[in-house]
């Protein structure tokens, strides 16, 4: 509607928040404009000839990697953003902690991409009524309440969201509506389980 803001997140833990009006309307075949300046691999540097201005609030991450955009989030009027890293750590941060900037900058730190955390896998807009689903490359799936994830500032490393096995990494995160299970349905489920155990 021309009045919303969006946030781009890179795998090196950076985020940039800007107005949708910063990206002009273009046709389907157009290349588009730079939303966020990412760290390029050595082979790509010579091809990067654009001259967009970097963000004044640019900060460095701990991991020295070629980066890519991993998430685009429409900024809610109120609420938070949950970031999840490859090694199963994450946190939720108020959207107000992210300053609005012009597009094309390097962004600010959204989560520390330390050796412990690994790269940023994804970010989602949440509030305390939502739940979060996390999945690993080994098929491990965890669903948890967003309110149970620690709420911290941008520069924090976060807490463990999912316990992973050796060489297993987190590959996806998504916010879902909370599902309330009525007590009578839960009791019936427990009774059925107990009967099954007795029969065995």
What is the meaning of each model-derived region?
Residues 1-200:
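Short, structured "edge-of-domain" segments at secondary-structure transitions
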């Amino acid at each position: 509607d021309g009045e919303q803001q969006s946030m781009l997140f890179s795998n090196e833990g950076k985020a940039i928040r800007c107005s949708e009006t910063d990206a002009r309307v273009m046709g389907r075949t157009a290349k588009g404009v730079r939303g966020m300046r990412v760290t390029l691999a050595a082979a790509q540097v010579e091809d990067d000839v654009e001259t967009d201005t970097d963000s004044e609030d640019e900060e460095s991450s701990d991991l020295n990697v070629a980066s890519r955009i991993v998430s685009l989030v429409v900024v809610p009027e109120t609420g938070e953003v949950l970031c999840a890293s490859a090694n199963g750590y994450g946190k939720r941060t108020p959207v107000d902690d992210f300053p609005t900037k012009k597009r094309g900058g390097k962004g600010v730190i959204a989560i520390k991409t330390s050796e412990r955390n690994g790269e940023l896998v994804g970010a989602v807009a949440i509030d305390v009524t939502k739940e979060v689903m996390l999945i690993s490359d080994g098929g491990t799936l965890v669903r948890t309440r967003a309110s149970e994830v620690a709420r911290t500032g941008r520069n924090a490393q976060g807490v463990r969201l999912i316990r992973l096995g050796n060489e297993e990494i987190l590959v996806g995160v998504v916010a879902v509506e909370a599902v309330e299970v009525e007590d009578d349905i839960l009791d019936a489920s427990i009774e059925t389980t107990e009967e099954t155990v007795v029969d065995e």
